[in-house]
Structures are given as structure tokens and as C-alpha cells.
Amino acid sequence: GHLRSRPMANQKASDGADLWFVTMDGTAKISDLRHDPHVHLSYFQNGYDWVSASGIAEVSLNREKIHELYATDWKAWFPKSGDPRDGTPDDPRIVLIGVTIHAAEFFERTASRPVVLYEVVKGWLTGETPEIGSTLSLDDPHRPLQER
């Protein structure tokens, strides 16, 4: 298959996975994950910070966990279509995706925009790599992030 990106929002932190997401059962993303659970997540914030992570996703129908993580704004994504399809934690359409991270790369830009511009021009002139931030890598494909 092909790699696909989908916009999704992290849910609050909870035991059982490094990251949690909520979605509707029976969608293409659920089918894709059941076929191949390997995932890649990317985050970019304010032009400064960037995170890239890869891991294994697991689809969860655990109603206790759904109740624990439930937020009322989920109702917007699960419109009422008759009992029990009402966007509440007992709505059978709601499933969770738990992701266990195995590798991650973090970049934090520490330089201001003028310094970044200076560093880029300096790099063009000198051939040196611009110094605009720091990178941290966590990479152990055999150990979930929770165990490190």
C-alpha cells in the first residue's frame, strides 16, 4: 500500500499507549491499521518545534478506556443517528487508536528569525550547516517508549 496522512488530534494521556486518538469504527483508517499497524506521526508548532515519531497502532474497542478519555467535543464527530449512536461514550461507532512509539525525533528551533536568516546566508557563503536549533533522537525499534 501507500503511505497516507490523516489529520487527527491527540487525546489526553493515559496508560496503555504513548498516544491516544479517537475515530469512527468501520472507516478506511481502521481497515488500514488492521492490515498494517505501523504508523508515522508528525507534529509542527509555531514554526519552531517539530516532532516525528513512528510506532505501532492498536485499535481498541475498550469501553472503559473510551469512558476514561471521553471529551464532550467528540459529539461533533459522531452526530446522533438514533440510540445508541448519540456521540456519548457508549456510542458503538467510537473506537480508540492507541499508539506505542518506538522511535522519535525532536527538533527545537532556538534561534530567532533574524538569526536563522543570518545562519542560512552564512551557510550559503561558507558551506557550513546553519545552527538554528537542537535535535534529539530516541530510536529503539525493539522497546516501546514507555519502557525507556
Where in the sequence are the language-model features?
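An N-terminal domain-cap segment
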Residues: 1-16, 32
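Short glycine/serine/proline-enriched coil/turn segments at secondary-structure junctions
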Residues: 1-2, 47-49, 107
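Well-ordered beta-strand positions in beta-sheet-rich domains
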Residues: 5-7, 52-54, 135
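A generic structural motif
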Residues: 11, 42-44, 107
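Short, structured beta-strand-loop surface elements
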Residues: 29-101
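C-terminal edge-of-domain segments
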Residues: 86-148
